Amino acid sequence: MKKIRRVLALVLVVSSLLAVASVGVLADAIPGQRLAVFDDIGQMNSSTFTDVSSKTWCYSGVKTAYNKGIMLGYTDKTFRPNNNVSWAEAITIAARIHAAYNDNLIAEPSQNEAWFMTYYRYCSERGMLPSATPAVGKLSQSINRYNLAYLFAKTIDDQDMPKICDYAIGDLSSIPGYYKASVEKLYAAGVMIGVDSSYRFCGTSTTSRGQIATVISR
């Protein structure tokens, strides 16, 4: 039962990460419900981040995502909610989800290396990284939804994402072949339903840290 609940929670987290443009459809969700099966590993308070206060639009989302260890801040005590999600951040989140799903441990970072390198190695060793992944020195660049889909389609096994949905992808014909299977897998599993009433994927779009924190915590 615990395994099933964890799988469902992880599917919902992935769903949220890839559906940030459809926040309205989750307006009635209970804050923190999606991540309730995960233990808190942190405790955000008023002094945790200098740029997120109780009046910030994404405060509750940031607090839940931080407390669950899904998203953390920067060394200068900022969260930077309006920044686009970077490759390094997406890879880190994917590694954490995959490790939680598989009961794996992620190695401690080596001394004097970039903070994301242990997560990069974790994903690289498991064949999770898309071919478009930039060089390590450029992982601070923003990641688009095509590459998010590819990356997060690798986090949960196919048998735990059965086909339960028949939504037609509004812009399927424009999705590059390399990403099509990942997008179709996530649509079929009901993990994502697109960003508008036509269920378009809009793969070249990016998303912000505040948006992701808000939706994954619902």
Per-range role (PLM):
Residues 69, 190:
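Phosphate/pyrophosphate-binding loop motifs in nucleotide- or prenyl diphosphate-using proteins
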Residues 63-68:
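Mature N-terminal segment immediately following signal peptide/propeptide cleavage
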Residues 209-211, 215-216:
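Non-catalytic cell-wall polysaccharide-engagement segments
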Residues 4-12, 18-59, 72-146, 154-181, ...:
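Feature responds to low-complexity, polar/acidic, surface-exposed segments characteristic
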Residues 183-186:
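Extracellular C-type lectin-like domains
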